Amino acid sequence: MKLIYTDDHREHAGAKEMRYDQMIPMSESPERMDLVIQGLADAGFQDIVKPDVFPDDHIHAIHDPGFVRFLEVAYSLWKKEFGPGGFATAYTFGMRGMDQVPNESVHSMLSCYTFDVCVPIVAGTWKAVRSAVDVALTGSAAITAGERAVFSLCRPPGHHASGDLAGGYCYLNNAAIAAQFYLNAGIDRIAILDVDYHHGNGTQRIFYERNDVLYLSLHARPEDEYPFLMGYAQETGACEGENYNVNLPMPLATAWHDYREALQHAISRLQAYRPDVLIVSLGVDTYKDDPVGGFALESEDYLRIGELISLAGLPTHFILEGGYAMAALGRNVGNVITGFEK
């Protein structure tokens, strides 16, 4: 399997995040990707391809142009006010009844275009975010050209980002941009299977009223976990998108037996839908020791996840999302791809 990768992700580094009552170094760090690359190499996957560069039109097909401009200029505006170094982050967030049209103030933009404190912007954030899109689109181009499976090693991740909001370590939605690429290429039926521990609220919002992308998400119950306000089973889509959104929330401490049932159900829905391409938003923060997770999967379970996904029998585009248990991250990702390629 081809691995699409660029070192540009390293530009997004050095910020901190607020986790409940503590300010800590970002869990979403460049070291994550080093471990993923090593884990894939240990599993025998070393066919690394650099991404091509794609026009911004692909981004604007999913994301609001004002939002994209914000991501591009936020740090330079922040630096003018506070000097170099540090990171830009919001002090306030848009609320119901408040004017949400941003002005040229970086504070206004941050308030309008982010929904939590987990998307700090440093000097190199835009370069990393923009390159991650190219990583995703290079994978889409490869599948469109006939590859049966590819893995886009995107960092930062993307599934919490919606059309005009960044949050949850995510800035642009790599999976959604990839899906739109396929549609624009004349591939009519696309499915996204999201196996990250957290619900992909951004992906859901983007496609919720559309019937050209089936979105299925296995995740922790929003009663218990981030993003808290979305990811309920009754959220099935709206308007033309009714029944094109499938949420499979699970309780804390979910282990393989119950997770397998949910994944098998998702695969059955995929097989009934018969998409032309499957995008897998691959997060492994479902692991038992993940610092931001609460499930109880073992490393061996990721082999089984890969095997079950392969049963769909579809051209498959893996896109990296979360996973923060450093000691097992590379092994878990490698196991998914090993199981899939058996």
For the regions a language model picked out, list residue spans one by one.
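HDAC/HDAC-like amidohydrolase catalytic core signature
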Residues: 1-193, 198-342
